[in-house]
A protein has these predicted regions:
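Minor-groove-contacting beta-hairpin "wing" of winged helix-turn-helix DNA-binding domains
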Residues: 58-67
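Non-catalytic recognition/regulatory regions in large multidomain proteins
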Residues: 2-3, 38-41, 56
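Short amphipathic alpha-helical interface segments
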Residues: 2-30, 83
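Short amphipathic alpha-helical interaction segments
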Residues: 33-48
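Short, amphipathic alpha-helical interaction segments positioned at domain boundaries
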Residues: 66-83
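A short, conserved structural fragment
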Residues: 47-58
Length: 83
């Protein structure tokens, strides 16, 4: 597998949030693809830039009222299907 850029990692996290809203599930599914540190860093960045919001202690949602999901690059489609 090729090395993913930080932008690719954040896009992957956003699309994974569409599939798994619970933070615990999100970390579990992404841990096969990304290091936990990268998942946490990407999630913190997405929350800080208001592209993702936390709903209660466990639920994470894309903040589509604030910003649209970026287009999914071809190189991430297969990775996303596998998580």
């Amino acid at each position: 597998m090729t090395e993913l850029s930080m932008n690719d990692k954040m896009i992957l996290i956003q699309y994974a949030i569409e599939k798994y809203e619970k933070e615990e599930d999100l970390f579990q599914k992404l841990s096969n693809t990304l290091p936990e540190k990268d998942i946490q860093r990407g999630l913190d960045t997405l929350i800080g830039t208001q592209r993702v919001r936390r709903i209660g202690p466990e639920i994470i949602q894309n903040n589509t009222s604030h910003t649209e999901l970026p287009e999914l690059p071809e190189n991430l489609k297969q990775i996303l299907e596998n998580i």
